[in-house]
Swiss-Prot record:
The keyword Ribosomal protein applies. The gene is rpmA. This is Large ribosomal subunit protein bL27. GO terms for molecular function: structural constituent of ribosome. Keywords: Ribonucleoprotein, Ribosomal protein.
Length: 85
């Protein structure tokens, strides 16, 4: 017989790496075309003027300019715009 109990096993011991989501450029900041403004899951922020959306819902600038956060429509959806400099 063993004089110590077996070590056993566990079902834990793993974790996913951070996804680095969130707002990367804030209102009023000067950005260049192609710069990422928001990384998100789903459309918490919607693309507005001069803003594109990637397949993972990342919002990015289509032109050089200043970032502006507004709300749009009857549902007051948060929208990101880029005003040309």
């Amino acid at each position: 017989m063993a004089h110590k109990k077996g070590g056993g096993s566990t079902h834990n011991g793993r974790d996913s790496k951070p996804k680095m989501l969130g707002v990367k450029k804030f209102g009023g900041e000067l950005i260049s075309a192609g710069a990422i403004i928001v990384r998100q899951r789903g459309t918490k922020f919607h693309p507005g003027v001069n803003v594109g959306i990637g397949k993972d819902h990342t919002l990015f600038a289509l032109v050089d300019g200043h970032v502006a956060f507004t709300t749009k429509g009857a549902m007051n959806k948060p929208t990101v715009n880029v005003a040309t400099a």
